[in-house]
Design a protein with these regions (language model features):
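Intrinsically disordered, low-complexity polar/charged tails and linkers
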Residues: 1-222
Length: 222
């Protein structure tokens, strides 16, 4: 009878930590009439194939102008849930310009009727701010201003930063989840449906040891 083989996993190599995406909020400093903006955008929008920066898509209520890279691969045109006080603008910008990493980047910009702005798909504050400056300058060239008053970029703020790194090895998610819960007593859930992965909450508090466990007496949001 053959003796059992003592399997040892190969060593992993962790890549450098990188910022994958950020969520930015800002404000025009004045309300904006989204219907007026929708009516004036068609002449200045660019098609998907056009190799330059520009506005690719504008989604307002149940209407849509243009298309984005994501639409082509998902066969989606209009968001299932449409809100009448907001619109979605998809712009194409050059990222890492002047370097060997230069390329096109599509950015989603949500515009709210009260003047609020939410931007996703950006990787740096500088790129986000420059993109919003470009959007403002572009809107200001329209024959009729959709803004109620003088617009500017106000309350620019980073709301969320997503980072990631790779181990370049297969991860046994079931075993990892059990290890985090049973061995380290961390808050963890194992997702096996649409967005597969191990969702772990590591609570950080400067007043307690870095074991990742919430020290609050009552349930909190971390």
């Amino acid at each position: 009878m053959a003796e059992p083989v003592d399997y040892k996993a190969p060593p992993y190599e962790r890549t450098a930590l990188r910022i994958s995406t950020m969520v930015i909020t800002c404000h025009w400093g004045t309300p904006i009439h989204l219907d007026v903006l929708f009516d004036q955008l068609p002449p200045i929008m660019i098609p998907m194939w056009y190799p330059d920066i520009g506005i690719l898509k504008f989604e307002h209520k149940n209407k849509v102008l243009g298309s984005s890279h994501k639409d082509i691969f998902t066969n989606r045109k209009i968001t299932p849930k449409s809100f009448f006080n907001q619109s979605t603008l998809v712009i194409r910008r050059m990222i890492h310009e002047g370097t060997d990493r230069a390329g096109w980047k599509e950015v989603n910009v949500k515009l709210f009727a009260n003047g609020g702005i939410q931007m996703t798909g950006v990787t740096s504050e500088e790129f986000a701010y420059q993109s919003l400056e470009w959007v403002l300058q572009t809107i200001q060239t329209l024959p009729v201003s959709p803004f109620e008053g003088k617009a500017s970029l106000e309350r620019f703020s980073v709301q969320l930063i997503n980072t990631d790194y790779a181990l370049n090895q297969f991860i046994n998610q079931d075993a990892l989840h059990k290890l985090l819960v049973n061995e380290y007593n961390l808050s963890s859930t194992l997702e096996k449906t649409i967005y597969q992965g191990v969702n772990t909450k590591f609570y950080y508090n400067t007043f307690h040891s870095g074991n990742g466990i919430c020290q609050c007496e009552n349930f909190c949001k971390g």
